[in-house]
Each structure stands twice: as C-alpha cells, then as structure tokens.
Amino acid sequence: LYYIQEPSAMTPANVLPIEEGDVVFDMCAAPGGKSTELAAKLNKTGLIITNDISNSRAKALLKNVEVFGVPNLCVLNEDPVGIASRFSGFFDKVLIDAPCSGEGMFRKDNKLIKAWEKNGPEFYSQIQRNIILAGADMLKPGGKLLYSTCTFSKLEDEDSVIHLLTNRPDMHLIDIKPYEGFSHGFDTDEGYHLEKAVRIFPHKMPGEGHFVALFEKDGEDYTSSKRPVSGKTKLPDELKEFMDSTTFEYDPAYINIRDTRVFLTSPYMAEERGLRIIRNGLLLGELKKNRFEPSQAFAMALTKDQFNNCLDLSVSDDRVIRYLKGETIDIDDFNVKSGWTLVCVDGYPLGWGKNANGQLKNKYLAGWRWM
C-alpha cells in the first residue's frame, strides 16, 4: 500500500509528469521506490521498464514492484548505456536517478564519507554523462527526461546538465513547479538557464540533499511503441478456466508460455533477444500436470472484486500474521468456496490459498514469508 522513502528522494518521480498510456524507463531503479510511484501514475496502463545494472539489486527491484502489483512491467539487468541503441526514440518519459558521490546523504549516513574518499565526484561524473546522453537518445521527440542525484557537487549536477545540453541540442531544460524549500540550480552566464533546475538543501526542507533537472526533447511524436500481433492465441484449457474465474482484463494475444510458466507481456515491449531480462510482463502462474497454479505476482495485481472466491481478513485478525508465516489457517467462520482463494486484508490482496473443508492451505510465496 505504501513505500517509505526519504522525503527528498520522493521528488524525482513526483516531478516527472507521467500520463496514463506512457512508456516509461527508470534507468537506475533499485531498490524500486521511484518505480512504484511511476507505476502508480500509469495506473496499470502503458509500460514501465525498470532497470538496474546490479543483478542482486535488480532482483530486489523485481520484488518491490511485484509487491505493489505492477502488471505492466519489464525488469532489466542491463548497463543502460549499452542498450541505448535497442530503445532509440522509444520512451515517452525517462527517469535517471544517477549513481553519485552521495554528498547529500552524509548527514544521514556518515559512512558514505569514506565511500566518497574512495570514489568522489570525478569518478561519478563520467558515468553520469554517459548515462544522461543515453537517456536522451532513448527519448521520443516531445518526451521528457528527469535527471537527479543525491549530491551537492556542481560537477555531477549542473555540469552534467551542461554536458547534455551541449551534446544533444534537441534537449532543453523546462521549469519545475515551485515547492516550498526548493532552491534554484547554480546558474552560469553561459545561457543554459540552470536556474530551472532544483537544489534541495537539508536546512531548507525536511529531507537530505538532492538535485533535480527536467528536460524536454524537441519535436512531436506520432508513432506508437505498440508491437503488432498476428492471429488469435489458444490458451490451454486449465489456464482459460482459471482466467475465466477472474474479471482481470487481458488480451490473449499477449499471453506468453515459456516452458511451464505463463506470462502476460506488454503490447509495448520491444524484442527481447539479447537483453538480460529479470521479468518481462506479469507472471500469471505455472502449468503443472493439467492444472494451473496462479502466482504471487498475479495475486498482487488483482483487486478483491476481480476474483470469484475471496477470503477478506481484518488487519487485526491474528490469522493475517499466521498466513504471512506460511501456516495453514482455519477459516470455518467464513463463507468461502473450495479451491483457489484470494486472501485479502481489509480488501487488499495478500496472496493465494487453497480451501478444503474450512482449512486454508497456504500458498503465500515461500521467499516472502515472515520468519
């Protein structure tokens, strides 16, 4: 239902204007707080591709977006610079929360000072410049790019902005809606309008140090990123039977069965080959010996009224904790049909169970269970 973030860190995803139906790229996304806000703005439309260069962080990113029930997703584990040519002019919006020297976080975590001594602004500035150019190249004409860091370094902030504007003349800075505590970027007399960028200082706002700049790409785009499909897809009977028990909206043409796992992929997703993909689309579940078992991710993507058999527990019911720990629970006091059951808490889906004679066999994902 919510993701706790440091106040200043909430600013980038809040400032980037997302419209329903957009194709969005979160380039340096782990652990996923910004991706969840971007996905919330999309409201299960369009596509969000969320990426991290670290494999372990990308897997943590996947869990966070699946916890939030994001169906229209693709999670990558790529060097964002290396895939720029694959997604040239593809995205309506790009968010770059760039790796940085972290000067704005020293007050919160003084261990970062030692990391800064090892790799400071000079180290990160070159990485940032490559990333910001790649982000601009992946943006459609008329699209918007948000660049942010959690550092005070002018080399990593305003100088990165100047690097983009100098090397991509079709990009320009645009104004960010004022907010109490925002400060202007450090301007120069070179005509780059750096006052349109925003600096956040901890003595002016209840958060740590941050820098945010919003760009727009010249031109207008009339092309769709949707990929065409041909013909109709016949679903296995056991899968169709389960999907018919839901009112979840989907296009069978985008059902993709890989070995035994069933995915609902996005009509916007580009060709997969050659990409390190952690997850492409919503994992619906798995086909096992003439039966279909729905996934944890599918449960999180549903609403209570989209499945025909629900157990809705109160948040104060001690069975909620027992369910989260993976225990079988007694549900004799509920009018729940036998078979697959969507377990909810105050109307919000939590996972699956299988009811047999008033005993709910626990199907909560093992890796998510409380110890």
Residue ranges and their predicted role:
Residues 19-20, 84-97:
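A short acidic, Gly/Pro-enriched loop at the edge of an enzyme's catalytic core
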Residues 21-30:
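Conserved class I S-adenosyl-L-methionine
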Residues 31-44:
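Conserved SAM-binding loop of SAM-dependent methyltransferases across substrates and taxa
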Residues 42-43, 139-141:
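Helix-to-beta-strand junctions that scaffold the AdoMet/dcAdoMet cofactor pocket
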Residues 51-89:
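S-adenosyl-L-methionine
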Residues 56, 92-133, 150-157, 180:
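Mobile active-site "lid"/loop adjacent to the S-adenosyl-L-methionine
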Residues 91, 144-147, 152-263:
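Class I S-adenosyl-L-methionine
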Residues 208-211, 216-371:
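Polybasic, low-complexity RNA-engagement segments
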